[in-house]
């Protein structure tokens, strides 16, 4: 490339890839973090304690259950058998829900596990399976009315589940949920569908730009891996409103390479760009002096976002778990702190109490 910059992905061959030492890759999520706030991306690469969330755990349980059902061995079952999918799907979801709960509770930073969200996850699973019926050319139906033969028809269009895609140059990677045959494709031969299952809030109108870019990212990596495939469509499947959104647009791989060039982590922290959108769901606020300063100076309204406080433990009753904390405030841009007049109490239980006793 010009001025010693690496050549674009499109002209790198396998031998070049092997000779190029890559210590990081760009993914849709890391790209989004970097654009929202370079400091957020930098902190995410520092090995800080992870934070779990119910939404993420529930979504993972649904995704893993769809994968399990797509890969289910039903070769020895009678094709006319009915009434099996409802119980099988629920059992698979319960198994994955239990696994996610263990992972959740084993994460250093986590809120309360909400068992009551299982029914919502089950509804999301039913919505996700409905998309597969539609793509296989089957009418919408209750799970109890799905025969073995019908599910085989679904499995026949599934090419891959939870597939990891990597660019030829090794700098870009993505993990897609489903790669399907598209029997309805009108472009010479059977097309493919890159499908990403979304269990969160659906868009009000069109796709969010970040989601659109994520889908195009997967589409373009799939095209690069299989250049002989003429038609590859990228779709976002929103189970909450049972709606499919198609992503359109030109290739974004060159744009991704440009982003990759800027994302090489240095010892010096990247610039922070605090904002309501960047900070609301940031998992690393407690390690960001700019977050504390912005809160302290009233530049951010912390009442409408998840808050990570920097506090000092004033008192703890080891038996009851009753604790008194004092909020600390920043004194400079480097993260120096001092005490304040704001104190608050809390009752600590379970792992939180065990950890603070240490």
Predicted regions and their residues:
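N-terminal amphipathic/basic-hydrophobic helices that include classical n-h-c signal peptides
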Residues: 1-17
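A non-catalytic, helix-rich entry segment at domain boundaries
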Residues: 8-10, 68-157
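Structural detector for short beta-strands of small beta-barrel domains
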Residues: 300-321
């Amino acid at each position: 490339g010009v001025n010693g910059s690496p050549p674009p992905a499109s002209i790198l061959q396998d031998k070049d890839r092997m000779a190029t030492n890559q210590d990081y890759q760009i993914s849709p999520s890391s790209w989004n973090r970097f654009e929202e706030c370079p400091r957020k991306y930098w902190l995410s690469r520092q090995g800080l304690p992870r934070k779990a969330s119910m939404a993420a755990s529930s979504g993972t349980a649904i995704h893993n259950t769809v994968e399990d059902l797509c890969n289910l061995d039903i070769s020895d079952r009678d094709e006319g058998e009915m009434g099996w999918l409802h119980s099988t799907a629920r059992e698979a979801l319960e198994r994955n829900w239990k696994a996610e709960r263990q992972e959740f509770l084993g994460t250093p930073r986590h809120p309360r596990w909400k068992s009551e969200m299982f029914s919502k996850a089950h509804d999301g699973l039913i919505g996700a399976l409905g998309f597969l019926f539609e793509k296989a050319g089957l009418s919408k139906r209750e799970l109890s009315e799905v025969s073995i033969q019908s599910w085989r028809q679904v499995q026949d269009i599934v090419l891959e589940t939870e597939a990891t895609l990597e660019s030829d140059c090794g700098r870009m990677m993505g993990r897609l949920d489903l790669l399907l045959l598209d029997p309805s494709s009108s472009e010479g031969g059977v097309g493919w569908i890159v499908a990403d299952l979304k269990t969160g809030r659906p868009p009000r109108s069109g796709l969010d730009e970040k989601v659109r870019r994520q889908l195009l990212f997967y589409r373009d990596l799939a095209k690069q891996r299989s250049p002989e495939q003429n038609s590859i469509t990228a779709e976002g499947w929103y189970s909450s409103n049972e709606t499919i959104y198609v992503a359109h647009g030109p290739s974004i791989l060159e744009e991704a390479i440009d982003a990759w060039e800027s994302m090489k982590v240095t010892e010096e922290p990247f610039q922070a760009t605090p904002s309501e959108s960047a900070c609301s769901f940031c998992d690393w606020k407690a390690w960001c002096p700019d977050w504390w300063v912005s809160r302290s100076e009233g530049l951010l309204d912390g009442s409408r976002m998840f808050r990570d406080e920097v506090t000092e433990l004033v008192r703890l009753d080891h038996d009851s778990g009753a604790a008194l904390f004092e909020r600390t405030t920043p004194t400079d841009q480097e993260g120096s702190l001092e005490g304040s007049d704001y104190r608050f109490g809390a009752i600590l239980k379970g792992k939180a109490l065990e950890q603070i006793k240490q």
